[in-house]
């Protein structure tokens, strides 16, 4: 039986990937379909992906598959053919090709079985996830943006919305998708006569969200096929105006794809226009936040002076200070991106 998980350190794998001369293509895809045995499917796909030198993050569950991967350019068509042949449900599956891609998005393959491919918190036995809203193509999206009876709902996290979104799109203020679903229903109760257009990065969240809205009595529900990635690609190919403003946040090493030239976010430390996410360099924090080049130099890549000072300590002292600390210094609240200069150690009652 071959080894069906990685045994090499992350640092070694990253160095190996960066030394590669062959270009890579970043691809994302998902499919809601019944998988009878997710563990066996996971093992078979792991062998297929490994044979083609595919890196990335893949989740499988009884409800389907969700993947963000990096494929050697020379293997893309072979990968496509083998994926389509793997299961009849995957034949012809849309593969979202990254828009702004240096091919260095992943350097290890992680494939996990989960309860859901998207953590939605739905436990209603009568919910039909297949009863989704209507798909919208790029030209239809632009038409809806000009329709006064249409409301665009962003089903991504705050830090994603913060750096880029469709014109006049509504943000659902929540930290997770499972929190967003009931809030979306609540916020839209007064707008049941409107056309509800839902979107996300690649389509997986908004597809399920559209079904949830219909389950809760909303009849005029659409969602963007392929999400932001496919919309921007098709709009450019068809010579249409791209109505997404800013950057599309992505969950890999790139942390974002440039869609338009506008910078709509600001540095969390000084307030200068900036939409570059980074993780705090302090190993006891690693907070995701927005930092401009000036502040990156000033704080040495850290989110605060406290983290800057702590990251300069000897490794043993850093480890001693991290002991018993659950979530780093929490100088920022990740969900809303607000600076809090008074809070150093988390309040256990929060």
UniProtKB/Swiss-Prot annotation:
Q: What is the effect of changing residue 114 to A?
A: Reduced 5-carboxymethoxyuridine formation
Reaction equation(s) it catalyzes: uridine(34) in tRNA + AH2 + O2 = 5-hydroxyuridine(34) in tRNA + A + H2O
Describe what happens without this gene.
Answer: Deletion mutant displays only slight reduction of 5-hydroxyuridine (ho5U) modification at position 34 in tRNAs. Cells lacking both trhP and trhO show complete absence of 5-carboxymethoxyuridine (cmo5U) modification in tRNAs; cells display a temperature-sensitive phenotype and decode codons ending in G (GCG and UCG) less efficiently than the wild-type strain.
* Gene Ontology MF, one: oxidoreductase activity, acting on paired donors, with incorporation or reduction of molecular oxygen
Q: What SMART domains does UniProt report for this protein, alphabetically?
A: RHOD
The EC code for this enzyme is 1.14.-.-
Consequence of substituting residue 206 to A: Does not affect 5-carboxymethoxyuridine formation
- Main EC class the enzyme belongs to: oxidoreductase
Active site, renumbered: 200
Recorded hits in InterPro entries, A to Z, give: Rhodanese-like_dom, Rhodanese-like_dom_sf, Rhodanese_C, TrhO, TRHO_N
- Its domain of life reads Bacteria
What PROSITE patterns does UniProt report for this protein, alphabetically? RHODANESE_3 (PS50206)
**Induction and repression of expression:** Is expressed at all temperatures, but accumulation of yceA transcripts decline with raising temperature. Thus, its expression is repressed by heat shock.
Q: Which UniProt keywords apply?
A: Oxidoreductase, tRNA processing
Extract the HAMAP family matched here: TrhO
PANTHER family from the xrefs? TRNA URIDINE(34) HYDROXYLASE, UPF0176 PROTEIN YCEA
Family the UniProt entry places it in:
Belongs to the TrhO family.
Known role = Catalyzes oxygen-dependent 5-hydroxyuridine (ho5U) modification at position 34 in tRNAs, the first step in 5-carboxymethoxyuridine (cmo5U) biosynthesis. May be part of an alternate pathway, which is able to bypass cmo5U biogenesis in a subset of tRNAs under aerobic conditions.
Name this protein carries in UniProt: tRNA uridine(34) hydroxylase
Native source species: Escherichia coli (strain K12)
What high-level taxonomic lineage is stated for the organism? Bacteria, Pseudomonadati, Pseudomonadota, Gammaproteobacteria, Enterobacterales
